[in-house]
């Protein structure tokens, strides 16, 4: 597959590099990641082609996470914008965390369950404004959210392709971002986010990640993706910034005790036998289940 013209023609728009027969999509960063990927090892992630390693082995990328700064393309995450007067109530009915106490600019990690209290998926909820949120997830949830939202005063937009995302993880990540951000990140708390700009380009930054180390996730308009990638690599050179693939990320998230759908658990939507389904308590996520909040899907079973 990698001898295909889609990898040879670097001038093609990332939207057009696959035909209807290829089944895979390309990230807004692919024009950069494909040239940097010495190993040409790739994985499928939510229908996208994602780098496994950039170098022939993962060691340097792993140690960049732990000792320097690692730059990861996380654009394949599913991203949905929920906006409107009933947005808080909708999300509160979907997830196990108490969304009513989520502050503007705060991010909450949460699972969500089926009626039997078995986990469908997990992800984050970002409160962008009074009545506007972004929810991220590993697999598609748009139809399910739309179904639950029936009759509510909300709009739901699939933001997965229009918003690109990068993770900058590691002990040097804050210094790199402070060197280009219009707003200092020194006071940004864990699981909070801010809007800022990099040399005039608008971005949002959340102090979140999947490594257990100091790190941030950067949310970018798709059309600005390459500008931001180039800027980060340029400003991060002296800090040891390293493009990093999913292999090193896997090791880091295991060390941090963070779970992954289809590896550590099976979505209750897809489990063929009942014993493959898991409750949040069985996954070590009991801390994220708030039984004293308003009713939510699966609460009675839990």
Stretches with model-predicted labels:
Residues 73, 122, 217:
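Acidic active-site catalytic centers that drive phospho-/nucleotidyl reactions
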Residues 61, 76, 86-91, 108, ...:
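Generic hydrophobic, aliphatic-rich segments that mediate packing or membrane embedding
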Residues 2-113, 118, 247:
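Acidic, proline/glycine-enriched N-terminal capping motif
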Residues 60-67, 112-122, 149-152, 197-205:
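Short amphipathic beta-strand starts and helix->beta connectors
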């Amino acid at each position: 597959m990698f001898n295909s013209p889609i990898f040879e023609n670097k001038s093609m728009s990332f939207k057009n590099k696959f035909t209807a027969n290829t089944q895979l999509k390309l990230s807004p960063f692919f024009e950069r990641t494909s040239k940097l990927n010495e190993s040409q090892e790739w994985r499928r992630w939510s229908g996208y082609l994602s780098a496994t390693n950039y170098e022939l082995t993962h060691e340097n990328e792993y140690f960049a996470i732990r000792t320097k700064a690692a730059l990861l393309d996380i654009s394949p995450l599913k991203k949905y914008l929920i906006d409107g007067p009933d947005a808080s109530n909708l999300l509160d009915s979907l997830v196990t965390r108490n969304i009513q106490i989520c502050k503007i600019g705060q991010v909450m990690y949460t699972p969500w369950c089926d009626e039997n209290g078995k986990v469908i998926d997990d992800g984050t909820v970002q409160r962008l404004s009074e009545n506007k949120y972004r929810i991220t997830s590993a697999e598609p949830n748009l139809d399910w959210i739309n179904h639950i939202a029936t009759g509510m005063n909300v709009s739901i937009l699939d933001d997965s392709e229009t918003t690109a995302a990068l993770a900058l993880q590691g002990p040097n990540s804050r210094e790199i971002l402070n060197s280009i951000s219009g707003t200092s990140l020194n006071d940004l708390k864990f699981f909070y986010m801010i809007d800022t700009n990099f040399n005039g380009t608008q971005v949002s930054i959340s102090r979140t990640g999947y490594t257990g180390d100091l790190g941030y996730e950067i949310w970018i308009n798709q059309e600005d993706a390459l500008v931001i990638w180039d800027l980060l690599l340029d400003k991060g050179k002296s800090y040891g910034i390293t493009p990093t693939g999913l292999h090193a990320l896997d090791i880091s998230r295991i060390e941090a005790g963070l779970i992954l759908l289809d590896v550590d658990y099976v979505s209750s939507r897809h489990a063929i036998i009942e014993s493959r389904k898991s409750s949040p308590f069985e996954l070590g996520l009991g801390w994220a289940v708030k039984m004293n909040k308003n009713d939510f899907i699966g609460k009675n079973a839990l």
